[in-house]
Amino acid sequence: MILFSPDERNNMTDASYHLPAFYELWARWGPEEDRALWARAAAVSRDYLVKAAHSKTGLVPNFGQFDGSPWGFRGPETAAFREDAWRVAMNWSVDRSWWGKDSRQRELSDRLQRFFESQGMETYGDNWKLDGTLIRDRHSPGLVATNGVASLASTDGARARKFTEALWNLDVPSSKVFRYYDGLLSLMSLLHASGRFQVIEPKPRAVNARASRTAVTLPRASSTAAR
């Protein structure tokens, strides 16, 4: 399982570091001697994300123990849903869209989007206790963006459309406080949702490699958001 750090923080993990979409890619096309390891890592991370997500809200902790439970090693705030945790829905949703190996990821997106929809699409806060208790009411572009990517795995077309449109309608982030969490996550989310963050399958001697894309299709209200 991925560690938070190889040195003094090697007794904990971070759900946002679990990237099964990439592990699966390396398991298919990485060095042959490493492929079995990456295949196991992908399976472990898929299971971990399910364990880490709260059963009602879908929120995940910023830092966690290896069994999926939150770990507040620096106080309660490090066990809450905070900036690192914004990225987690993007991780499982891209994995679902690229590889489609874990049907549980669809429920994770549904659960998370259902929670944030209930808090007000234009006003929901960005820091929460896992049970849905609000900690900070800042409506952050970075979280709006990654919640939009969650539509890649959602089964509720009408709800997924709301979150995708919220991503699309974001102003370009200009905050100097969260230049990464707002700025870069917004950029990455637009790439994911538009299908421009791609897997290029290796094709020896091929002039043009076939691109495998992810994209959110804005559906009719009765259809699903992810194909």
Q: What role is predicted for each listed range?
A:
Residues 1-145, 152-158, 180:
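Extended ligand-binding clefts on enzyme/binding-domain cores
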Residues 122-227:
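C-terminal functional modules
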